């Protein structure tokens, strides 16, 4: 097209004919070129228009339009141009061709041209023309597409709406799907647009649109720049991303403008809406955002003529799209006005008719034959043309409705059904309250998607010959969404509801293309019944009289009964005399024969969700299920409805199932016990007991108001009963002694009562914990067998004296190992009433209560009118937790953040950032057990942790042997600010406790070690704590046996931990380093599961801007950091570029195994006491051993640091006077290629990096931090090592190879000029 000015028929000069056509498209009016030059001064618009009677051919029948030829040629009555597909009512007088909108074809502009679709969008959405199919040529069979959805016909093995997707990340090429290494594997290779975020999964990276869920503070409607009202800001962003378009928020609240109904659109003046200028059909490439688009019409249930709106919905990336199944073709018996004929009618253009049939049907053209493996893919049948009409189809799927009431629709036989659906067209369904409104856009989108999927399944089932259509009647909350549908069949069909249900189930299970996913087991979640049995299943207000019905085409807002909570789900009853309101549908014109046989409707078997399934109890509380609700039994120090409150007690109170545990007491021959208690009732409850595997039981308990002392030496019990009656509510003092087989008991100073056990052994071995007030549930069985007592004390204990040692019973005591259900004596947790909304408070154990709801309120404290987690407001990968104070909290998996876990975390997006996990008290990391990382864990353990704590309580790590509260374990835990390192080897726990509280909000370095029974904990390199586990005379108990997972920062259920660990809360803070024998554990590839983990934002290495330049990797070092520079750069921030020097230059020195060069250990001077070392150098060698660098003293048992090649790998070894530390690289260097080495030491912490490998780290096990040297540094080797160093032979062998670009303490070392001795210095050859 020539780019010269032209004059338009509107009298305006345009820069070119293209500019004129663009304007014509935008204003949606007839505009053509009248002059191939600029318009003259007297524009055509200024000339008065002549009446048609004065034209050459006179007027048309409307007496307004001028005829274009003889015989009313070109007049609207003759042309019959479709008013939606054409620009005007007139046509060419010679050919009769109307002026069509873009993509519209046919003489009358009443159909989409080949390669275009969505004629209906011109009518309902005022689109500027038909939408291009954009079928991908390498994956599609044809260029045209299915007219209702835009779905292209794909070749075998290719999927996607536009046939542009291959499975498993393969690339679509001329020969089909081929594996392509260029497919994005990581997010660094992928650029996401339109608000999408990159997600890595199964070796692929893809773009994921944000969820449509919104926080409460954003739950208000907004008006988009496309003229559409959205439920909230989040829905707008989601739809914009799915459409691949930019939609901005114009203002809060609904859009003011309304879309005119079709009845009000004038042919002569069709005003474009803002939507006309927005390309809603934009296709984003697979490499950018692999999305799948499907079109779902929304029915606008308003008075007057019905308008169908089209909205674009995008499925999840990589989801296979499916064509919409139709029904057998048949001729229409009713005529239709030509302006509503849509794209399926005959247009008069015989050349385009065949193509139009194909584009409407999706059937492959004749002659096409492509071999494929696997079961045949269902091919959609021809769709009826009524889908493109103004009021859509009747329930028979063929007849076009002439009005919104469907007054002309033929009768159908109606079945109703309910399905519990999880996915539709690859999109996971989540219920939202907006789905209750049949007028909402969300209801329309979801319903249309479900109808398309079910139409496809029924259209390929064994009942398809009588099947007509499916209509969605209602959406309701379930697990996740309950769908109520109407299934329409031929009124003369012989199929019953069982046949229909069986056919649908068969398709759901066997269909290869999963257009709809029903919750498993499918047979329990699909139910079809006859229409007159529908109230039993749905309890809707549908009439039960009409068994054959004429459905209307508008959405019917039938109320749907919400299901009660899962624990109380019951099937609704039908009242025999209940009056059911009738619907607005017309009476049926035909009826089926009366229903003659009884149909038994059996409710589907639904998995019963127990109240404790969601693990509602916090901080290690035990959930107890009563079948309707739950209560939490809290550990000592916790209380509240779900153990959310911190309890501080001074005099412990026990509730019958409570207890406190202490260390095992020594009572082999003698023991003296004194205690003071107050009981609230007298039903034979134990006060204190301790056992040894069922033998030897010492036990106090009130029996009918009297205290008993029992002791057993292995055969029979010795029993002494007091004579003083115990009075409820009074304090009593009890003293008991045992000396071998003799015992004594006295209550409140009464005369001593003497007794003895039967003859046997005199000694009593006790090896379990001492329990006060009761026992753990699993220990109570043994107590019941020996004493008939079934519960613990209900009351208070203020004194316990064992062998003249008074135990501290307070909550923060060091004597208490662990406990459960203990509170302050005299406290009433129900005063004041913690239950909201008039809930009734029931006191349970001490400091614990249960709220009984009144009315419709629920939750731990009756704070919520509805379950805030049903439906789940969180992202699909997150867990929803009901809060005791009301509302909910989303527990995000690792990689997601935000109030609703709606965002991908920054650390997940930037894989180059350092990973410093931050914990919030409910977070945890789960890994494989530490026994899987090292082989010699049984006898020895060495771990280092660098952490920053924000709360004085919380678990740092735990690994155990069992999940029943017993067994071996190792743990590190903060308790009241003190750090506790515990391990149990089978005889009892060793407890190593810090001498002072750990400082908060600063980085702490802790090293824990175990060798046999002996343990050591070093804190911040200056505090040393030692201890050992209990010993046994029968077994050594020196091995640590671990079998379970390793948890960091917390766990999903603390009840599975060993009770002796005393862990009841998660860690709050950040963990910078966690290593096991220098093996770093905090790597993402080691993590099996994670919850509520985010990256610590307050360290330089995790901030948005990387402090290391030129691609350097930031390595955290407490508050500071080190930069691991890429090759060719050096400096603290890798800001210096190293010049590449010639290999024959003076700075590339060759070493022959006898060349030993001496330097100052800090380049310019000698330092005798060094806290920090930093080395960088490049080496080239073929040798498998040789000493590269040495700094230290040449004396026995002296400090040193060294670099050497050992077995072809670089090793860094240093000894600060306590124990040598060896770091070994994983990259071989004996390749005769230049390799860069970086090594540093900060106090006892060392790092080694060779090439681009991940740094290898380690630390000195004891408190030494200083390297004492003679001030010298040697390259290439040393004359003689001290005999006591016990280093490998490689350290006493000289280095053979080349060394260059040496950096010492971040200063360049001149290999020749800075040398202190004068050896023969050789140079490397010029050829590298």
From Swiss-Prot:
GO CC annotation: basement membrane; extracellular region
Domain Laminin G-like: 649-825, 914-1096, 1146-1324
Positions of the EGF-like domain: 608-644, 865-902, 1097-1135
Pfam families listed in its UniProt record: EGF (PF00008), EGF_laminin (PF00053), Kazal_2 (PF07648), Laminin_G_1 (PF00054), SEA (PF01390)
Gene Ontology terms: biological process: cell differentiation
Cysteines joined through disulfide linkages: 7-39, 79-91, 81-98, 100-109, 112-130, 133-145, 135-152, 154-163, 166-177, 207-241, 214-234, 223-255, 612-623, 617-632, 634-643, 796-825, 830-841, 835-851, 869-880, 874-890, 892-901, 1101-1114, 1108-1123, 1125-1134, 1298-1324
Domain SEA: 411-533
Gene Ontology molecular function terms on file: calcium ion binding
Kazal-like domain residues: 1-41, 201-257
Spans annotated as Disordered: 322-384
Glycoprotein as UniProt keyword: yes
Family annotation (PANTHER family): AGRIN, PIKACHURIN-LIKE PROTEIN
Its biological purpose: Plays a central role in the formation and the maintenance of the neuromuscular junction (NMJ), the synapse between motor neuron and skeletal muscle. Ligand of the MUSK signaling complex that induces the phosphorylation of MUSK, the kinase of the complex. The activation of MUSK in myotubes induces the formation of NMJ by regulating different processes including the transcription of specific genes and the clustering of AChR in the postsynaptic membrane.
Protein name (record): Agrin
Underlying gene: AGRN
């Amino acid at each position: 097209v020539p780019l010269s000015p032209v004059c338009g028929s509107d009298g305006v000069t345009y820069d070119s004919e293209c500019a004129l056509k663009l304007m014509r498209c935008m204003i949606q009016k007839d505009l053509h070129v009248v002059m191939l030059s600029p318009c003259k001064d007297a524009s055509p618009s200024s000339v008065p228009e002549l009446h048609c009677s004065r034209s050459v051919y006179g007027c048309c029948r409307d007496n307004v339009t001028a005829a274009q030829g003889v015989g009313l040629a070109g007049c609207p009555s003759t042309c019959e141009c479709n008013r939606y597909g054409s620009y005007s009512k007139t046509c060419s007088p010679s050919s009769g061709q109307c002026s069509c909108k873009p993509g519209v074809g046919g003489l009358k502009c009443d159909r989409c041209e080949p390669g275009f679709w969505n004629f209906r969008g011109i009518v309902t959405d005022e689109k500027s023309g038909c939408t291009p199919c954009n079928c991908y040529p390498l994956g599609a069979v044809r260029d045209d597409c299915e007219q209702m959805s835009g779905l292209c016909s794909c070749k075998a093995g290719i999927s996607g709406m536009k046939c542009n997707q291959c499975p498993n990340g393969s690339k679509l090429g001329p020969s089909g799907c081929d594996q392509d290494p260029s497919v994005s594997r990581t997010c660094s290779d992928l650029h996401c647009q339109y608000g999408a975020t990159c997600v890595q999964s199964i070796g692929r990276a893809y773009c994921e649109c944000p969820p449509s869920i919104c926080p409460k503070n954003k739950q208000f409607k907004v008006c988009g720049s496309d003229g559409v009202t959205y439920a909230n800001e989040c829905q707008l962003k989601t739809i914009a991303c799915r459409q691949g378009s930019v939609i901005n928020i114009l203002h809060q609240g609904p859009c003011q403008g309304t879309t005119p109904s079709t009845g009000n659109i004038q042919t002569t003046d069709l005003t474009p809406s803002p939507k006309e200028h927005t390309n809603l059909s934009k296709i984003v490439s697979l490499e950018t955002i692999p999305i799948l688009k499907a079109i779902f019409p929304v029915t606008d249930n308003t008075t007057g003529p019905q308008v169908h709106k089209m909205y674009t919905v995008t499925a999840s990336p990589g989801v296979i799209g499916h064509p919409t199944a139709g029904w057998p073709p048949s001729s229409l018996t009713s005529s239709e006005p030509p302006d509503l004929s849509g794209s399926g009618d005959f247009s008069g253009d015989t050349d385009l008719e065949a193509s139009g049939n194909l584009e409407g049907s999706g059937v492959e053209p004749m002659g096409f034959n492509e071999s494929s493996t696997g079961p045949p893919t269902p091919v959609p049948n021809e769709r009826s043309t009524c889908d493109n009409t103004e009021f859509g189809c009747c329930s028979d799927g063929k007849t076009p409705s002439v009005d919104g009431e469907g007054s002309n629709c033929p009768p159908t036989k109606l079945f109703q059904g309910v399905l519990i659906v999880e996915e539709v067209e690859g999109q996971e369904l989540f219920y939202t309250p907006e789905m209750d409104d049949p007028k909402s856009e969300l209801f329309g989108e979801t319903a249309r998607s479900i109808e398309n999927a079910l139409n496809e399944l029924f259209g390929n089932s064994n009942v398809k010959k009588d099947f007509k259509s499916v209509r969605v009647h209602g959406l309701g909350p379930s697990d996740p969404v309950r769908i109520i549908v109407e299934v329409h069949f031929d009124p003369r069909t012989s199929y019953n509801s069982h046949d229909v249900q069986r056919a649908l189930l068969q398709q759901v299970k066997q269909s290869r293309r999963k257009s709809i996913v029903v919750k498993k087991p499918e047979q329990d979640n699909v139910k079809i019944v006859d229409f007159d049995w529908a109230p039993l299943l749905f309890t809707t207000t549908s009439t039960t009289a009409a068994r054959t019905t004429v459905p209307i085409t508008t959405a019917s807002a039938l109320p749907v009964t919400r299901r009660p909570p899962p624990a109380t789900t019951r099937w609704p009853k039908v009242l025999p005399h209940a009056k059911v309101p009738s619907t607005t549908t017309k009476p049926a014109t035909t009826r089926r024969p009366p229903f003659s046989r009884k149909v038994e409707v059996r409710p589907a078997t639904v998995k019963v969700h127990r109240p404790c399934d969601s693990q509602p109890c916090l901080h290690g509380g035990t959930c107890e299920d009563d079948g309707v609700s739950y209560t939490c039994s809290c550990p000592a120090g916790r209380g509240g409805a779900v153990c959310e409150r911190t309890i501080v007690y001074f005099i412990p109170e026990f509730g019958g199932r409570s207890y406190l545990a202490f260390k095992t007491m020594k009572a082999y021959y003698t023991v003296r016990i004194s205690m003071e208690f107050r009981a609230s009732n007298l039903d034979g409850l134990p006060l204190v007991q301790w056992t040894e595997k069922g033998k030897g039981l010492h036990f106090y308990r009130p029996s009918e108001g009297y205290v008993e002392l029992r002791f057993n030496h292995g055969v029979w019990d010795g029993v002494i009963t007091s004579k003083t009656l115990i009075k409820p509510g009074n304090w009593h003092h009890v003293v008991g002694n045992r000396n071998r087989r003799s015992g004594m008991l006295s209550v409140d100073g009464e005369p001593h009562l003497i007794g003895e056990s039967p003859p046997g052994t005199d000694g009593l071995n006790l090896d379990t914990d001492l329990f006060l007030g009761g026992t753990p549930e699993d220990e109570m069985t043994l107590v019941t067998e020996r004493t008939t007592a079934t519960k613990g004390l209900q009351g208070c204990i203020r004194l316990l004296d064992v062998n003249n040692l008074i135990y501290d019973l307070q909550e923060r005591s060091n004597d208490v190992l662990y406990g459960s259900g203990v509170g302050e004596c005299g406290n009433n947790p129900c005063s004041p009433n913690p239950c909201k909304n008039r809930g009734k408070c029931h006191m349970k154990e001490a400091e614990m209560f249960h709220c009984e709801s009144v009315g419709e309120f629920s939750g731990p404290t009756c704070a919520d009118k509805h379950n805030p987690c049903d439906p789940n407001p969180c992202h699909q990968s997150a867990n929803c937790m009901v809060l005791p104070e009301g509302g909910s909290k989303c527990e995000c998996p690792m990689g997601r953040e935000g109030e609703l876990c709606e965002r991908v975390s920054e650390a997940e997006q930037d894989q180059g950032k350092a990973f410093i996990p931050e914990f919030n008290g409910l977070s945890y990391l789960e890994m494989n057990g530490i026994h899987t990382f090292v082989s010699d864990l049984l006898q020895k353990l060495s771990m280092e942790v660098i952490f920053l704590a924000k709360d004085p309580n919380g678990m740092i790590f735990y690994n155990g042997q069992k999940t029943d509260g017993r067994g071996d374990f190792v743990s590190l835990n903060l308790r009241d600010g003190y750090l506790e390192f515990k391990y149990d080897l089978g005889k009892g726990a060793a407890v190593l406790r810090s001498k002072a509280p750990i400082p908060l909000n600063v980085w702490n370095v802790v090293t824990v070690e175990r060798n046999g029974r002996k343990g050591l904990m070093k804190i911040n390199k200056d505090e040393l704590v030692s201890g050992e586990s209990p010993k046994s005379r029968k077994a050594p108990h020196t091995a640590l046996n671990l079998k379970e997972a390793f948890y960091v920062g917390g766990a999903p259920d603390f009840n599975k931990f060993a009770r002796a660990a005393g862990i009841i809360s998660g860690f709050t803070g950040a963990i910078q380093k966690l290593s096991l024998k220098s093996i770093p554990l905090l790597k993402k590839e080691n993590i099996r599961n994670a919850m509520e983990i985010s990256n610590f934002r307050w360290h330089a290495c995790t901030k948005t801007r990387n402090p290391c330049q030129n691609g350097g990797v930031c390595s955290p070092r407490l508050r500071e950091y080190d930069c691991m520079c890429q090759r060719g750069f050096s400096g603290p921030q890798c800001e210096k570029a190293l010049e590449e020097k010639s290999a024959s230059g003076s700075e590339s020195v060759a070493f022959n195994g006898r060349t030993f060069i001496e330097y100052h250990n800090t380049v310019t001077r000698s330092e005798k006491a060094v806290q920090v070392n930093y080395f960088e150098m490049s080496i080239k060698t073929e040798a498998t051993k040789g000493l590269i660098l040495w700094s230290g003293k040449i004396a026995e048992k002296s400090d040193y640091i060294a670099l050497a090649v050992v077995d072809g790998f670089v090793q860094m070894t240093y000894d600060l006077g306590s124990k040598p530390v060896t770091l070994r690289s994983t990259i071989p260097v004996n390749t005769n290629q230049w390799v860069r080495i970086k090594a540093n030491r900060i106090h006892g912490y060392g790092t080694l990096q060779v090439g681009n490998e991940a740094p290898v780290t380690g630390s000195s096990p004891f408190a030494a931090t200083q390297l004492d040297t003679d001030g010298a540094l040697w390259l290439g080797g040393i004359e003689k090592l001290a005999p006591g160093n016990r280093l490998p032979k490689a350290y006493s062998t000289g280095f053979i190879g080349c060394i260059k670009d040496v950096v010492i303490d971040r200063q360049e070392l001149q290999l020749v000029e800075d040398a202190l001795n004068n050896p023969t210095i050789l140079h490397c050859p010029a050829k590298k």
